[in-house]
């Protein structure tokens, strides 16, 4: 049998490709507005497209992920390659906002295919190392842009944003298809040594399907927490270049930020995933989310004081944000088992779609109406703080029970 780590790193490559469609977007927003000035496009118009891109992917994941548990990931990976190539590759030739929204949404569905496959590979093949395996997979999504953002920026300057969309769409789509060729679900009855499971982690012995999960209140608690912590990082992802322009940050500093923030984003997933396997998911979430709130507030004042401080704060924002995409799937696997992990997580991941609309279009609209990014940053910080406090309550609520089981009124706190 092929080593499970080979499958994990193949999924990692696919995640790098789709990550660029999200984390390189900030480079394209202003060139698109400028190119369509004759149609009176504004920043908020194109940023709504970013929100719809993420929403389309996250909201279709439950339908896509159901195929992984039944047929395996290869078909979805091939489908993703086509959707990403067509959707992303055509964005430079749109003639209206409607076609722009539709094509970026198509790319978003392609992204969802790969994301569902990647998370499934981590949780299914690594029930003993969910934190670190999920961290590696989601790090590819967040970290890959560190290598590609300078290339994207250079291509936009030399061949224009339209051709950059086209050629990167084709190459990314092809690499996604190739990465999917080695991905399969583990065999029936696949298990790992029980001794490898860490005692700090609460885990359920039962596997829940999506309908059983949706009937438990714990799921909606996690959904709200993920929604609130997701907004700040998605806002900075979409608005990094416009914010830098408003803060009068130099081009060199922006280039450095475009490299370091994806590295911080990806590193946060591995770092906090590893910590969570020992410290516990809930304490890790509380610590990281609280720091996220602090750094978002600091960005409104200290971020304006100079290039160095801007870069440092943006790096810290991403270093305390990316972990949500490893901690929540790992926690969901702890609560509801790994058998139906792909489909189960797709429902929780849909929270990102709502967060993207708040962090992209609404944040840009607030800036256009008020002339400052402070409202968007401080509002995101308040929500991150609320999510941090909710993480403390996760430690005290009981593990979910199936409807046929007696519901326990007290659950020992672990970690």
Regions found by a protein language model. Name each.
Residues 25-30, 211-270:
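Extracytoplasmic gate region of multi-pass secondary transporters
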Residues 27-59, 252-256:
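Extracellular/periplasmic helix-loop-helix junction of adjacent transmembrane segments
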Residues 32, 113-126, 134, 323-336:
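Intracellular juxtamembrane helix-capping segments at the cytosolic ends
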Residues 32-33, 67-68, 147-159, 244-245, ...:
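Interfacial helix-cap and linker-helix signal at transmembrane-aqueous boundaries
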Residues 51-66, 259-271:
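Central cavity-lining transmembrane alpha-helices of secondary-active solute carriers
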Residues 59-95:
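Conserved MFS/SLC helix-loop-helix module at the cytosolic interface between two early adjacent transmembrane helices
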Residues 141-188:
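Helix-loop-helix hairpin linking two adjacent transmembrane segments in secondary transporters
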Residues 247, 259-265, 271, 278-331:
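C-terminal transmembrane helical hairpin of 12-TM major facilitator-type secondary transporters
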């Amino acid at each position: 049998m092929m080593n499970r780590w080979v499958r994990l790193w193949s999924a990692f490559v696919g995640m790098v490709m789709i990550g660029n469609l999200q984390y390189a977007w900030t480079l394209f927003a202003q060139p698109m507005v400028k190119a369509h000035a004759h149609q009176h496009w504004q920043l908020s118009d194109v940023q709504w497209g970013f929100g719809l891109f993420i929403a389309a992917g996250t909201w279709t994941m439950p339908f896509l992920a159901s195929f992984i548990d039944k047929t395996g990931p290869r078909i979805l990976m091939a489908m993703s390659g086509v959707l990403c190539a067509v959707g992303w590759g055509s964005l430079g030739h749109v003639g209206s906002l409607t076609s722009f929204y539709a094509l970026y949404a198509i790319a978003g569905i392609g992204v969802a295919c790969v994301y569902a496959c990647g998370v499934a590979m981590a949780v299914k093949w690594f029930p003993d190392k969910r934190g670190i395996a999920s961290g590696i997979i989601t790090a590819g999504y967040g970290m890959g842009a560190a290598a590609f953002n300078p290339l994207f920026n250079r291509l936009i300057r030399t061949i224009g944003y339209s051709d950059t969309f086209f050629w990167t769409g084709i190459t990314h789509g092809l690499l996604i298809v190739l990465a999917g060729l080695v991905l399969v679900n583990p065999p029936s009855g696949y298990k790992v040594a029980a001794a490898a499971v860490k005692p700090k982690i609460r885990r359920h012995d039962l596997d829940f399907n999506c309908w059983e999960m949706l009937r438990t209140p714990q799921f909606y608690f996690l959904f709200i927490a993920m929604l609130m912590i997701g907004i700040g990082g998605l806002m900075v992802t979409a608005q990094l270049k416009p914010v830098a322009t408003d803060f009068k940050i130099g081009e060199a500093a922006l280039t450095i930020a475009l490299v370091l923030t994806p590295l911080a984003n990806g590193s946060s997933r591995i770092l906090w995933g590893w910590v969570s396997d020992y410290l516990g998911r809930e304490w890790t979430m509380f610590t990281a989310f609280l720091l996220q709130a602090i750094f978002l507030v600091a960005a409104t004042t200290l971020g304006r004081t100079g290039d160095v401080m801007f870069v440092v704060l943006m790096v810290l924002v991403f270093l305390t944000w990316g972990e949500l995409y490893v901690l929540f799937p790992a926690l969901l696997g702890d609560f509801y088992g790994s058998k139906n992990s792909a489909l189960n997580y797709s429902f929780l991941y849909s929270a990102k779609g709502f967060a993207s609309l708040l962090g992209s279009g609404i944040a840009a609209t607030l800036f256009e109406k008020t002339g400052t990014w402070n409202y968007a940053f401080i509002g995101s910080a308040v929500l991150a703080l609320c999510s941090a406090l909710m993480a403390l309550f996760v430690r005290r609520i009981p593990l979910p029970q199936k409807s046929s089981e007696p519901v326990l009124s007290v659950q020992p706190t672990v970690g």
